[in-house]
Amino acid sequence: MHLHEYQAKDLLTAYQLPIPPYHVATSVPEVEAAIQAEQWKAGVVKAQVHAGGRGKNGGVVIAHSPEDLLAAADKLLHMQFSSNQTAGLSLPVNKVLISPLVEIASEYYLAIVIDRKHRCPVIMLSKAGGVDIEEVAEKQPDQLLKMTLPSSGKIYGYQLRRIAKFMEWDQPIADQGNRIIRQLLQCFYEKDASLLEINPLVLTKDGSLVILDAKMTIDDNALYRHPELADCYDPSQENIRDVLAKQLGLSYIALDGTIGCLVNGAGLAMSTLDILKLYGGSAANFLDVGGSASEKQIQEAISLVLSDKSVRVLFIHIFGGIMDCAVVASGLVSAMQGQKETIPTVIRLEGTNVDKGKGMIINAGIPCEFVTSMSEGAELAVQLSR
């Protein structure tokens, strides 16, 4: 689950981390009230969206007067934000964060993230903060320090000394940096985060290290341990089909292909995506209905896939062990009968009640092509998608 910047800052504030004062507003009058309460004469207004690239795409506005602050807030609160990180979506800006300006001497990058290759957290730092870190890593890899962290959630003294040397911090600044890193690590572990990114971490002209921006992602699988974070979920920042899938209890991820997929089992679903790519096609989604889906869930799942206008072909790939092919067939018939238009449909059914399931589909007059293997189905689906 992604957090908004203000939500991440709320969490970090509880860990006594240095963050400039800020207010969150949903309307211009709320912004005006915050400005008057703080007596700010200048500041920054930031769109609260689940996307990077805000600074480059008009989502962050620096204002040098109260009037400019109000104008910036009014502009952002009516914005549909998009960038190269929104996957083609335009995200509504429902809230803005207002904060005073800070006199910056240097900007740094700091992140703690789960490295799936090494199966452990890593910490990454760079003296080139406030920019696209991907660009720095690609063009100037020597400007990025990356270290694996122990599973204990601590960081060793020699690692902190290496960080201070790499970042060229003198002892007073290194002492501040050490405390910030330790507190960030504590937050990362205690909140079951998969990402905690500070960009930028800044050194002010008076010699203080301050967190200006924060991005945080919580592991969905650990949310049951954090009921206090339930209200942080913002469905307005997600693809509507992702939101509906969560409500239906389905494992769905929108992709950018043209072949809609309905599969049972995550392993089979990933294999299906791979073989579609092998034959020159691409999936429009990952959808695992599991082994205990009901007829209603199958119906809703198919309707969900077909609601994506980029889908040209539907590929249903079921290997029924626990899953009953007759239940899948019944859900398919119900879903197709409710569609105004039909698209080419490729079906591979194997396992429990397969003959009964196929008979139900044939008797209902659902136009489709039955196949007997994964490769045959993938090849046909790719052909029909062209």
Swiss-Prot record:
Coiled coil stretches, renumbered: none
Keywords from the UniProt entry: ATP-binding, Ligase, Magnesium, Metal-binding, Nucleotide-binding, Tricarboxylic acid cycle
Domain ATP-grasp: 9-244
Record's cofactor remark: Binds 1 Mg(2+) ion per subunit.
Gene Ontology process terms (BP): succinyl-CoA metabolic process; tricarboxylic acid cycle
Catalyzed reaction equations: succinate + ATP + CoA = succinyl-CoA + ADP + phosphate; GTP + succinate + CoA = succinyl-CoA + GDP + phosphate
Enzyme Commission no: 6.2.1.5
PROSITE patterns in UniProt: ATP_GRASP (PS50975), SUCCINYL_COA_LIG_3 (PS01217)
NCBIfam families for the chain: PRK00696.1, sucCoAbeta
UniProt similarity note: Belongs to the succinate/malate CoA ligase beta subunit family.
Function: Succinyl-CoA synthetase functions in the citric acid cycle (TCA), coupling the hydrolysis of succinyl-CoA to the synthesis of either ATP or GTP and thus represents the only step of substrate-level phosphorylation in the TCA. The beta subunit provides nucleotide specificity of the enzyme and binds the substrate succinate, while the binding sites for coenzyme A and phosphate are found in the alpha subunit.
Protein name: Succinate--CoA ligase [ADP-forming] subunit beta
Species, as recorded: Chlamydia trachomatis serovar L2 (strain ATCC VR-902B / DSM 19102 / 434/Bu)
